[in-house]
Amino acid sequence: MLDRLYAIRSIGAKALLGALLATTVILAGCGTSSNAGTGGSGSSSLTACQATVANITNTTGNPSQTPTAPSAGVSGSISADGSSALQPLVQAVAAVFDQGNGTHSSINAGGSGKGLTDVNNGAVQIGMSDLYQSAKSISGLTDHQVAVVAFTLVVNNDIASKVQNLTTQQIKDIYAGNVTNWSQIGGPNELVTVVNRPTNSGTRGTFEQYVLGAKNEIPGNTLTQDNTGAVFQAVTSTPGSIGYVSTGFVTSSSASGSPAPICIDGYKADATDINSGNYKFWNIEHAYTKGPATGAPKALLKFLESSAVQTTLLPKLNYYTLTSIAQTAIQSHTSSSDPAPESFYSGS
């Protein structure tokens, strides 16, 4: 009789220990552990962290205010193209600048590679890029670092409640074409559709460098879109899809059924996880000129780097100031082979 009692107690203790361990896996939430959501393919890792529009929104500064551009004594036109992640900010700043100065600005996307090539060839006055010029084997341009952009993976709304977090290894497997159905990593039985960007994209370059570990994307079922907005729309309309966008496209969308942001290794695309070094999918935004900036482009860049813009339009469009990001984090995303940038920040 005593032997049976001891056996029952032993089984009960083991069951309790197992339950506690299972609870620990499920409760490994955002930012609570460097191992949160990693390892294994069970469904618990897919819900170990939840990124929302609210918790990836930059709430600093005065985003409700619109700056006024002082007269800079310049005229004529300003041309820029390149990064579709940086375009919304430069476009918004240029609109205010044009109103105060009578200039005419044309701010287009096309990808960071195009921006660097076009400014180098003299096709535009400003080349917008998420990457350093050396990443595209270009040299001799003058860098102006104007903001920090956070990127996030997003999934179609139909799987948003079941896929909220992916480990780096799971992401690598998806983008290598090894995972083609969400059920392979504990998700729903639904085909994975990868919505990506062309090779000249700075967002893609950032993703490959800081998430895939410098590996190229070779997914199976793929849709390629030319700009960030097109990626956002494609993920919105394609069941089972996943893609990457700058967080401003997520926080500025109020449409029902919009793609949902997800965590990486239990961390989300916000300043806290960027500053801790745990979230690496972000980059410094560059506005390149051919030689030191002059004339109207210089005046526009000075306005962009002014506190009037940095404290209003940056947070409104969900960018971060460089000074709000820890120096250790900035250094981890700085190219040692590129020259120091030209700066128009106050006190510089």
Residue spans of the language-model regions?
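Bacterial N-terminal signal peptides that target proteins for export
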Residues: 3-17
